[in-house]
């Protein structure tokens, strides 16, 4: 069988030794019913600690399973029968527990989206695929580590200033064009206040304050039929269409930002804003912050206001982000590496 599970499902099964939803026949396909406790513990140590709340793991357990890419989705087939298909933006890892085949296209897509592929032999992981294009120079990495020690707050402030400023620009656009009162001036005030804080904790606090104002404003712009109550990152069956579309958009944005970070020689795991954690591409998440609102949110808001039904159509959502402005993202990555190498001020991307 091939199982797709979230971190919450795994934790629930693991802690109770599968004495939970595993007992319900209708849900057995989604849990680790036949996995030994020893194997579960190994998987937990190897993969689960790095699993973001909005990602899933695909387990390949059936002998002879074949993974390929069809219509942009990672698809599992057994004897030419489709067992499941999943968007790469939803995946954190693919764990292969038995003899199976994986096409080179799956490996390519996994590389582009930062999906780990882990191979197990019995109860032991014996291989993990990492991107071949990962090629940062030693000089850049040393400077990046030095900047991480000495300029962490400076860079964190720049990333979040850019994020909040661009959120303000998005809400201000709708206020000016359609006469909404979205209290965008609060975001402008918070963005300016960020430049005066002195600690990373204060930066995160201002970001959280801005998020409340921003998503409240976004909610006012969306059709009520979408059921959007606020930003939710966790992947679940009950996720509203707009949040689901946001996750897809951010996943595709992450792919481009990751490529940009690697192309300029930076280490994607050494970030300034997001805390370091094994396997976490902290710098990619840092740089993404500036682009979330102008490159993802604004497009989806426009799509939802045009037709709420289009937000529920995955094909439409994917096509919406097929033309991400890669040039601007790569330019910003070069600006970041120059600021690190030359001890210059980093200027975030500011939408107009």
Swiss-Prot record:
Magnesium recorded as keyword: yes
Cofactor: Mg(2+); Mn(2+)
Any single Pfam family the record assigns to this protein: Cas_Cas1
Entry-linked InterPro entries: Cas1, CRISPR-assoc_Cas1, CRISPR-assoc_Cas1_C, CRISPR-assoc_Cas1_N
Tagged with keyword Glycoprotein: no
Enzyme Commission code(s) on record: 3.1.-.-
GO biological process: CRISPR-cas system; defense response to virus; maintenance of CRISPR repeat elements
Residues that bind Mn(2+): 207, 274, 289
Recorded family membership: Belongs to the CRISPR-associated endonuclease Cas1 family.
Biological role: CRISPR (clustered regularly interspaced short palindromic repeat), is an adaptive immune system that provides protection against mobile genetic elements (viruses, transposable elements and conjugative plasmids). CRISPR clusters contain spacers, sequences complementary to antecedent mobile elements, and target invading nucleic acids. CRISPR clusters are transcribed and processed into CRISPR RNA (crRNA). Acts as a dsDNA endonuclease. Involved in the integration of spacer DNA into the CRISPR cassette.
Subunit structure: Homodimer, forms a heterotetramer with a Cas2 homodimer.
Protein name (record): CRISPR-associated endonuclease Cas1 1
Organism for this UniProt entry: Saccharolobus solfataricus (strain ATCC 35092 / DSM 1617 / JCM 11322 / P2) (Sulfolobus solfataricus)
């Amino acid at each position: 069988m091939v199982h797709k599970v979230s971190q919450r499902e795994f934790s629930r099964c693991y802690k109770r030794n599968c004495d939970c939803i595993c007992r319900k026949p209708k849900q057995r396909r989604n849990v680790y019913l036949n996995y030994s406790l020893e194997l579960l513990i190994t998987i937990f140590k190897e993969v689960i600690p790095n699993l973001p709340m909005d990602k899933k793991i695909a387990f390949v357990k059936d002998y002879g399973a074949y993974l390929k890419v069809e219509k942009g989705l990672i698809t599992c087939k057994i004897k030419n029968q489709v067992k499941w298909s999943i968007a790469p933006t939803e995946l954190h890892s693919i764990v292969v527990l038995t003899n199976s085949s994986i096409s080179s296209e799956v490996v390519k897509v996994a590389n582009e989206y930062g999906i780990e592929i882990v191979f197990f032999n019995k109860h032991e992981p014996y291989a993990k695929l990492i991107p071949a294009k990962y090629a940062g120079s030693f000089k850049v990495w040393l400077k990046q580590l030095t900047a991480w020690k000495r300029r962490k707050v400076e860079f964190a402030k720049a990333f979040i200033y850019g994020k909040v400023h661009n959120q303000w620009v998005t809400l201000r656009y709708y206020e000016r064009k359609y006469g909404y009162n979205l209290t965008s001036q609060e975001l402008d005030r918070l963005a300016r206040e960020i430049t005066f804080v002195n600690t990373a904790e204060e930066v995160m606090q201002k970001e959280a304050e801005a998020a409340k104002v921003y998503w409240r404003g976004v909610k006012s712009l969306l059709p009520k039929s979408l059921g959007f109550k606020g930003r939710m990152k966790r992947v679940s069956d009950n996720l509203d269409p707009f949040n689901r579309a946001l996750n897809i958009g951010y996943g595709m944005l992450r792919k481009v930002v990751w490529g940009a970070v690697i192309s300029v020689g930076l280490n994607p795991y050494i970030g300034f804003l997001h805390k370091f954690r094994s396997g976490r591409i902290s710098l990619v998440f840092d740089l993404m912050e500036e682009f979330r609102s102008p490159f993802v949110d604004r497009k989806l808001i426009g799509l939802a206001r045009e037709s709420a039904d289009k937000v529920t159509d995955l094909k439409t959502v994917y096509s919406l982000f097929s033309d991400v402005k890669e040039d601007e993202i790569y330019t910003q990555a070069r600006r970041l590496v120059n600021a690190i190498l030359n001890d210059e001020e980093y200027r975030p991307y500011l939408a107009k």
